[in-house]
């Protein structure tokens, strides 16, 4: 019986070219999952796995949500176990649930949480280097928090989007940016209705520039008015970014 299934997925994105299919490579999260599902249902047609977003190359996820229509009588636990048996060790299916016919992991999402992690100190973090952005000096947390308040709200985030050909609206709502420091780790946690291409990484780069005194807090409002990518901060490396949670009604 054809049924819509919802998947919660955890993955280490280090060796992948992002979530979405890419030409000339099979190293995408979507591709690996679809290959296993095709084998599971013994179908000539590859089942389409719809992700809640398009994570970039090198970005990680603790709870990516996806859905797919499958013609199978297997239980949700059996599907999960089968997938985990044949998926690479850097991709894990945490949960499989039956979903409503109209459920769409991307269009039904109402919020997302991302965490960006920096590691500070004089010595390189050899064993966690794939999951952090290493910076030797510690930025000014107080100044970054001041800037973060100005970056929150409903704004046109065109200056924080790396896609200059974006045709759809670049207005988004970011309702929370939390910056925490614990030991040598600095974490930027973002929650919003949705994020543009590279938006979280550009927001992080902008905040770090404030923290290092390369940008004034007072300059933040001008970035929304300018709608010019070249005026915002640098794009922080993909390694530090992780999708933490996706919200649905």
Language-model-detected regions and their locations in the chain:
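Structured-RNA-binding interfaces characteristic of tRNA pseudouridine synthases
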Residues: 1-249
């Amino acid at each position: 019986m054809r049924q819509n299934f919802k998947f919660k997925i955890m993955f280490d994105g280090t060796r992948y070219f992002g979530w979405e299919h890419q030409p000339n490579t099979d190293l995408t999260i979507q591709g690996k999952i679809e290959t296993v599902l095709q084998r599971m249902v013994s179908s000539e047609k590859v089942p389409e796995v719809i992700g809640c977003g398009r994570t970039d190359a090198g970005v990680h996820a603790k709870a990516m949500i996806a859905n797919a229509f499958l013609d199978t009588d297997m239980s949700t636990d059996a599907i999960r176990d089968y997938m985990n048996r044949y998926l690479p060790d850097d991709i894990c299916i945490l949960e499989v649930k039956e979903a409503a016919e109209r459920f769409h992991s991307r269009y039904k999402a109402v919020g997302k949480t991302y965490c960006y992690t920096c590691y500070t100190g004089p010595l390189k973090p050899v064993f966690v280097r794939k999951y952090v952005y290493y910076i030797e000096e510690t930025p000014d947390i107080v100044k970054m928090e001041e800037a973060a308040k100005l970056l929150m709200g409903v704004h046109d985030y065109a200056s924080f989007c790396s896609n200059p050909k974006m045709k759809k609206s670049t207005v988004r709502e970011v309702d929370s940016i939390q910056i925490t420091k614990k030991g040598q780790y600095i974490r930027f946690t973002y929650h919003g209705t949705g994020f543009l291409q590279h938006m979280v990484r550009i927001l992080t780069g902008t905040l770090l520039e404030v923290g290092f005194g390369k940008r004034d807090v007072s300059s933040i409002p001008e970035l929304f008015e300018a709608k010019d990518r070249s005026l915002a901060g640098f794009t922080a490396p993909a390694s530090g970014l992780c999708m933490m949670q996706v919200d649905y009604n």
